[in-house]
Amino acid sequence: MQVPGSYGNYVKMQSAVSATGDGTSLACFDVSFGYFNFATMQVTGITTATITFEANIDGTNWVAILVKNLNTGVEATTTTADGLFRVQCTGLMNIRARISSWSSGATTVTGIATS
């Protein structure tokens, strides 16, 4: 079991991307440390793009998940604006921020899973 503040999993999920794409997933489970409790993602650079937040437990089949916008408090499965987003990830294996539509801009998503 993790001790709060002892370890975090940091991933650049999308890096100045100018197209649709799956990006890199953020692992919510570490063999040495167990499950992380929360994942927080920072989205920057959106101009005309949509990010769909998704997760899986089998490493293959992705399902849209609700994330909380930490600025507005609103929960949604997508965003079209920059911001900080959080989701409880206990029990999930991976989370991704898929760019599901894109017209312009260079979108970056950075994620960290922590206990």
Predicted regions and their residues:
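Transition segment at domain starts
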Residues: 1-35
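Beta-strand secondary-structure signal
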Residues: 40-42, 52, 96, 110
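Tryptophan-centered short beta-strand motifs
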Residues: 10, 58-69, 73-75
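Conserved Ser/Thr-centered positions that define the repeating blades of beta-propeller domains
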Residues: 54-56
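Beta-sandwich interaction modules
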Residues: 27-34, 68-115
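A short beta-strand element within beta-rich, extracytoplasmic domains
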Residues: 35-45
